[in-house]
Swiss-Prot record:
The lineage of its organism: Bacteria, Bacillati, Actinomycetota, Actinomycetes, Frankiales. Binds 1 zinc ion per subunit. Zn(2+) binds at C103, C105, C125, D127. The keyword Ubl conjugation does not apply. It is found in: Cytoplasm. Pfam families: Anticodon_2, tRNA-synt_1c. This is Glutamate--tRNA ligase. InterPro entries: aa-tRNA-synth_I_cd-bd (IPR045462), aa-tRNA-synth_I_codon-bd_sub2 (IPR020751), aa-tRNA-synth_I_CS (IPR001412), aa_tRNA-synth_I_cd-bd_sf (IPR008925), Glu-tRNA-ligase_bac/mito (IPR004527), Glu/Gln-tRNA-synth (IPR000924), Glu/Gln-tRNA-synth_Ib_cat-dom (IPR020058), GluQ/Sye (IPR049940).
């Protein structure tokens, strides 16, 4: 394309979940437009009526908004189905120019002629002069010789001999355009200058480049095919096998900043040794020419670690605001009127340093707002053995008489544990399980200080009595 205004498009299909791979492609497109002062177009390719659902389109818009690509900052959404007449008109033009022809070959007939139904089309109907009719699709007449060279910012200049490109279908028997043609018509008429998409589309590119030329374009767009994303087994991410829905990460409590930063690393890297970098730095340095063509490994553990770092970078006030959706029903297991904002604020800083995703806040603080400790049977069995019963009895008694602060609580439990031959780490376990229901969580003594003397002693008494009852 020439040196005019840069225009990119993100063109998802509303046929299911919004994939993390789609999110990465959207971000790459967004940054190219942003850096060039150009335009980002959201085009929803909804021509497959049997699979499209309106809620999937809404999900795309919502996901982009979460990533910072907000309505009002881009053109669209443009529904591809609204342009069906333009696609049909292009198909007619190609046929009238002798660049396309009707074909009534079935898969069975092709298999009979070639011995393999999967074999590329053999051109049987090229010169039969068929007119439109039932069961007759329209095929593009590819050149017999020459080479189609694709200039790709990431993959160089792959070449495709034209005699290996079959005469491909561009319109169905009912006149509706297939993806290959509709995609090109829309890109051409919308003035798209850069097509940035996943490498799985690379095999379509020579066909689409031929269509660009056939429809009168002086030159094709700038192509950039970003690397495939793979799982830990180096298999392409699959929605049937892998956790790929952006919504599931959002609902689990991943921050958009962390997700954006991590997705950008799937094929690209900022300069220097730091991978966690301000978004402003990514905006100012991202360049498609720096994207590597090799497969990019989606490491959920690394993403989780990234998210933890982003959480810890928040102020306590920002953290409290971020976890708010998880602090009330239905996300929270406690009654709405049981939650106390002051109590939570007192432990928020302790929790912030320990969670990797926001949803982890619930099991970390639920003991503060539930009427009884949410005791896990495995935790109970692990902690409530040996001298636990007598220790809890002593703790219940002594905790009624001491100053109620974390330092005193720690010193007191250390002393009581020593009487029973237990180091502090071992002495803490039955007390923690009695009060919180779990073997791990917030710092124990700071938690007890916030929870309060009477509430703590009630939980310890309940555990003591349960042990006594056998």
């Amino acid at each position: 394309m020439g040196s005019g205004r840069v225009r990119v498009r993100f063109a998802p299909s509303p046929t299911g979940i919004f994939h993390v791979g789609g999110a990465r492609s959207a971000l790459f497109n967004w940054l190219v437009a942003l850096r060039a002062g150009g335009d980002f177009v959201l085009r929803v390719e909804d021509t497959d009526a049997s699979r499209n659902r309106p809620e999937w389109t809404d999900g795309i818009i919502s996901a982009l908004d979460w990533l910072g690509i907000s309505p009002g900052r881009y053109e669209g959404p443009v529904l591809q189905s609204s342009r069906a007449d333009r696609h049909r008109a292009a198909a007619v033009r190609l046929r009238e120019a002798g660049l396309a022809y009707f074909c009534d070959c079935t898969r069975e007939a092709l298999a009979e002629r070639t011995g393999n139904a999967q074999h590329g089309y053999d051109g049987f109907c090229r010169d039969r002069g068929l007119e439109p009719g039932p069961g007759r699709a329209l095929r593009f007449r590819t050149p017999d010789d020459g080479v189609t060279t694709v200039h790709d910012l990431i993959r160089g200049t792959p070449e495709f001999p034209n005699d290996t490109i079959e005469d491909f279908v561009i319109a169905r028997a009912d006149g509706s355009a297939v993806f290959l043609l509709a995609n090109v018509v829309d890109d051409l008429e919308m003035g798209i200058t850069h097509v940035i998409r996943g490498e799985e589309h690379l095999s379509n590119t020579p066909k689409q480049q031929l269509l660009w030329a056939a429809l009168g374009a002086a030159e094709p767009p700038v192509w950039a095919h970003v690397p495939v994303i793979v799982n830990e087994k180096r298999q392409k991410l699959s929605k049937r096998r892998d956790k790929v829905a952006l919504e599931s990460y959002r609902d689990e409590g991943y921050l958009p900043g962390a997700m954006k930063n991590y997705l950008m690393l799937l094929g690209w890297a900022p300069s220097g040794d730091d991978e966690i970098v301000p978004w402003e730095t990514i905006e100012s340095t991202f360049d498609l020419a720096d994207v590597k063509p090799s497969p990019a490994f989606f490491d959920e553990k690394k993403l989780r670690a990234f998210n933890g770092e982003y959480i810890r970078a928040l102020s306590v006030e920002e953290f409290i605001a971020a976890v708010e959706p998880w602090l009330a029903p239905p996300a929270a297991p406690w009654a709405a009127d049981a939650f106390d904002a002051g109590t939570f604020a007192a432990v928020a800083g302790l929790a912030q340093s320990r969670v990797s995703v926001l949803a982890e806040i619930v099991p970390m603080v639920d003991f503060l707002f539930l009427p009884a400790a949410p005791v896990d049977d495995a935790a109970w069995a692990k902690a409530m053995k040996g001298p636990a019963a007598q220790l809890l009895a002593d703790v219940h008694d002594v905790f009624g008489k001491i100053e109620w602060d974390a330092e005193t609580l720690k010193a007191t439990l250390a002393e009581l544990g020593e009487r029973h031959g237990l180091k502090l780490a071992k002495a803490q376990a039955p007390v923690r399980v009695a009060v919180t229901g779990r073997t791990v969580g917030l710092p124990l003594f700071e938690s007890l200080e916030v929870f309060g003397r009477e509430a703590t002693r009630r939980r310890i008494a309940a555990a003591r009595d349960r042990l006594a009852a056998g």
